[in-house]
């Protein structure tokens, strides 16, 4: 992905002409913002059509003020997305694959439920309902494993958030994918650890 700038131009007169950025299906263009008369875009793809010379199309670097605005906006988007993991008690998108071999809700409500079960189970076993609503007969030790994995997943989500934030803060405004990239958080799959041991 690369940063480009151009200056749209409209000529006056009875048959005025507007010169602007030419697009095609082979490239993805995201408008990043404007500074003075220039429009800054991020373009993904190499098959950029020839542009009218009147628009002064060129590879460019974002001006510092526009870069700062974009960084602030992206950090706010990241924070809002990450708060879904903390602020929403029930989050159906937040699940892990446990080392016990099944999917488990890992949101705050599920963690609280696990803590409650661990507190009252004693030496008995209990039915635990997984992410797919399948019952599993589990011991206290197995419930503790699930809780530990849910908490570890939460730590991993924060590490992913901080990595995105560091990349945004370190963006230079030249060829920074993170200025337009979608934030994707990956939930943990603890079943892989069993296979790799």
Where are these regions (language model features)?
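A preference for well-ordered globular domain cores
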Residues: 2-3, 9-35, 44-197
């Amino acid at each position: 992905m690369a940063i480009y700038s151009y200056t749209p131009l409209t000529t006056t007169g009875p048959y005025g002409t507007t010169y602007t950025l030419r697009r095609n299906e082979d490239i993805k263009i995201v408008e990043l913002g404007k500074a003075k008369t220039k429009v800054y875009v991020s373009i993904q793809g190499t098959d950029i059509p020839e542009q009218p010379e009147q628009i002064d199309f060129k590879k460019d670097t974002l001006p510092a003020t526009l870069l700062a605005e974009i960084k602030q906006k992206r950090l706010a988007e990241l924070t809002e997305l990450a708060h879904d993991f903390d602020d929403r008690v029930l989050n159906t998108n937040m699940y892990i694959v446990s080392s016990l071999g099944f999917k488990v809700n890992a949101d705050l409500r599920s963690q609280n439920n696990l803590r409650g079960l661990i507190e009252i189970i004693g030496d008995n076993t209990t039915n635990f309902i997984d992410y797919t609503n399948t019952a599993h007969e589990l011991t206290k030790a197995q419930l503790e494993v699930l809780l530990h994995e849910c908490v570890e997943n939460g730590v991993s989500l924060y590490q992913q958030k901080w990595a995105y934030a560091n990349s945004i803060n370190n963006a230079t405004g030249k060829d920074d994918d993170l200025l337009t990239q979608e934030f994707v958080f990956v939930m943990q799959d603890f079943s892989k650890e069993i296979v790799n041991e």
